[in-house]
Each structure stands twice: as C-alpha cells, then as structure tokens.
Amino acid sequence: MKKILIVVDMQNDFIDGSLGTPEAEAIVDNVVAKINTYTKDCVYATRDTHQDNYLQTQEGENLPIVHCIEGTYGWQLNEKVQAALGSAVVMNKPSFGSWELADMMVMEFAGLPAEECEI
C-alpha cells in the first residue's frame, strides 16, 4: 500500500498574510519536518488559487477577504515549505473541494486551513 502526504494550502496568505495567524506560523517547521519524512514521489501539495474577481465569486461573498490571488506573494507557498517540497506535484484548486487519487489507499494531510477547506 502506497502512503502519501498531502500538504494543504501552506501559502503565505494563510500563514502571515491576509488570513494568517500566529498558530499558522507556528506549524511551518512541523509541516517541513513531516514533508522530509516522505520520499518526494509520495508528496503532493494543494494551492488555493483565486483570480482578481475573487470578491465577486460565491466564495468571495461568503469570505470577503482577498487572498491567494494567482501570481501574488500571498498565493505562493511558504518559502520553507516550497524548499522542502522540491519537485513534488503542486495542484492549484479554485474552490473548496477535493480531487481524486484513486490509486492511493492511505492519505496523510498537513497544512492550512484544514477546518475550512478540504475535509
């Protein structure tokens, strides 16, 4: 059975940007340590991705805080996390939800904001 790690939305806006918190900043080193326990072919990451019209979207109406606009500093993965990920697959996601990994049987998640986005 292949075990994978999915690193969820470890982006600057969720760590120290428009939706950041001290708690989010505090977990960065732990997420990096977790990434480093996996081989890179077993690590995937998600990146919350919005466009300039975010506030006019359904999500933007419910959470009217501009964040993770594609191409901005806030959209980028945290520098330490990006370095640990190396060439791992990073998937942009435009909204709440999930993606299918049909061949994967065991998934472990690390990242932000798990209470709102993925699970």
Show which residues each predicted segment covers.
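Glycine-rich phosphate- or other oxyanion-binding loops that anchor nucleotides, phosphorylated ligands
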Residues: N92-A110, E115-E118
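Active-site acidic carboxylates
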Residues: M1-N92, A110-P113
